[in-house]
Regions:
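Internal, well-ordered domain-core segments that constitute the primary functional module
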Residues: 1-32
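Exposed, low-structure sequence patches enriched in small/polar residues
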Residues: 22-221
């Protein structure tokens, strides 16, 4: 039927890379870059496309066209940056990552529509302890946003972990290889803890907007 299109019966070729840099003159800081590409295996073999992760980041450099049946159109790709900064004396850290699941056309596209196809996570962790032998108190907060922005009205990026051609998405045996809240979702997490020797007592709150992308698709009229 027109409501269901079977997935390809084919294995997937996945390739990714991660670079991490920790500047020696800034204690506790680490910065990184990540990129990943996947496609169906038979398509990769036919086109000898075995190192797609090293191709140009921007779509203006595509050598194979922009149509859905081109080499670039068959790729499901993404990239992002991440960082973490730990303050040992303050017993605190801040971390975050910003990723895109759809390649930008050029630098201008990235600057003018930064929200298109993006997802991010930011978090804070702080430890309070008066003396080395006293009780430890911890506070944690994390915010994850994966819902599409209003730019979807002009060009749809689809939900995270999904792709129009690689319809299996970023999954392994049916499980999403990513955020546990799932595609199109947002969340906030708070936790307060007390550690007394070997005992830990915690209270946590989590708020999840489950698949807001689907809500927008279903009721946008």
């Amino acid at each position: 039927t027109a409501l269901y299109f079977p997935k390809k019966d084919d294995w997937r070729y996945y390739q990714g890379l991660t670079f991490t840099y920790s500047p020696k003159w800034i204690d506790g800081m680490s910065l990184g870059f990540i990129r990943w590409v996947q496609m169906y295996g038979e398509f990769a073999k036919t086109n000898n496309d075995y190192f797609p992760v090293f191709d140009g980041l921007f779509r203006k450099n595509d050598k194979y066209g922009l149509t859905s049946d081109s080499l670039e159109g068959e790729r499901d790709q993404g990239a992002g940056i991440f960082g973490r900064w730990v303050w040992q004396d303050a017993k605190a850290e801040i971390y975050g990552e910003l990723n895109y699941n759809d390649a930008k056309y050029n630098l201008r596209d990235l600057m003018l529509d930064t929200g298109h196809a993006r997802a991010y996570t930011i978090g804070i962790h702080k430890v309070f302890q008066k003396t080395p032998t006293s009780k430890i108190y911890e506070f944690s907060w994390e915010r994850t946003l994966m819902q599409q922005t209003s730019s979807r009205l002009l060009r749809d990026a689809a939900s995270w972990y999904m792709h129009s051609n690689v319809r299996h998405g970023y999954t392994n045996n049916g499980e999403v290889m990513g955020a546990g809240i799932g595609p199109g979702s947002n969340s906030q997490y708070f936790e307060f803890s007390m550690i007394d020797e070997l005992d830990k007592y915690s209270i946590a709150f989590e708020v999840i907007d489950q698949d807001n992308d689907f809500f927008m698709y279903a009721f946008e009229d």
